[in-house]
Amino acid sequence: MAVRAQFENSNEVGVFATLTNSYALTAIGASENFYSVFEAELQDVIPICRTTIAGSRIIGRMTAGNRKGLLVPTNTTDQELQHLRNSLPDAIRIQRIEERLSALGNVIVTNDHIALVHPDIERETEEIIADVLGVEVFRQTIADNVLVGSYMSLSNQGGLVHPKTSIQDQDELSSLLQVPLVAGSVNRGSNVVGAGMVVNDWMAVTGLDTTATELSVIESVFRLGEGLGPSNINTGMKDTMVESFY
């Protein structure tokens, strides 16, 4: 299922929300309909937490997480951390990270198996990502951009990358991640696909400006039209899917 939403006139859904297979975070704001889009699809399935991070509403750019964990910057307040711990399932590991590149959502893109990170991220941060999120970590660029989290959107089913990513880069990234990738855009031609949308294994939310063509590409590469609800996602299909996709 791919749906469109706006946060207070902004189409950058990935700036104001974080979505994984086990929880969702949305920014606190006057945009009740933004929250209700998530609520309509997710409320019976995974918890949705409305929060700020370090007093800021751009939570999608400040945090990075997957089914197993959530990483937040070091300037996240104690109250925010406690609120997250109270709202999310006990099994989710929540960890503050002391990292110079503190907009974690811009420098980390991850699914439940593999994370791609900014080439200059600190070694200690890399180890924390591997430990808390339970993933393999690779330093990468996307179309020569170091902000991998801004220019890529990733789930366990597929990925969308910056429209100018070369075929060779797409093939390399795809074999590394073991999921099919497509170069594309969101929000009527925006190349910041990571900031323009959020996705998990059964749902994507993009900006209101996203065209029907962009939406169909998103539904196709993330396999959202195939009735894969949270209960019947089979990650074992991954390898055969990659082979058949090419």
UniProtKB/Swiss-Prot annotation:
It is found in: Cytoplasm; Nucleus, Nucleolus. SUPFAM superfamilies: Pentein (SSF55909). GO terms for cellular component: cytoplasm; nucleolus. Keywords: Cytoplasm, Initiation factor, Nucleus, Phosphoprotein, Protein biosynthesis, Ribosome biogenesis. Pfam families: eIF-6. Signal peptide: none annotated. The keyword rRNA processing does not apply. InterPro entries: eIF6 (IPR002769). Phosphorylation at Ser-174 and Ser-175 promotes nuclear export. GO terms for biological process: cytosolic ribosome assembly; ribosomal large subunit biogenesis; ribosomal subunit export from nucleus. Its main location: cytoplasm. GO terms for molecular function: ribosomal large subunit binding; translation initiation factor activity. The modification Phosphoserine is found at S174, S175. Monomer. Associates with the 60S ribosomal subunit. Belongs to the eIF-6 family. Binds to the 60S ribosomal subunit and prevents its association with the 40S ribosomal subunit to form the 80S initiation complex in the cytoplasm. Is also involved in ribosome biogenesis. Associates with pre-60S subunits in the nucleus and is involved in its nuclear export. PANTHER family: TRANSLATION INITIATION FACTOR 6. HAMAP family: eIF_6 (MF_00032). This is Eukaryotic translation initiation factor 6. It comes from Verticillium alfalfae (strain VaMs.102 / ATCC MYA-4576 / FGSC 10136) (Verticillium wilt of alfalfa).
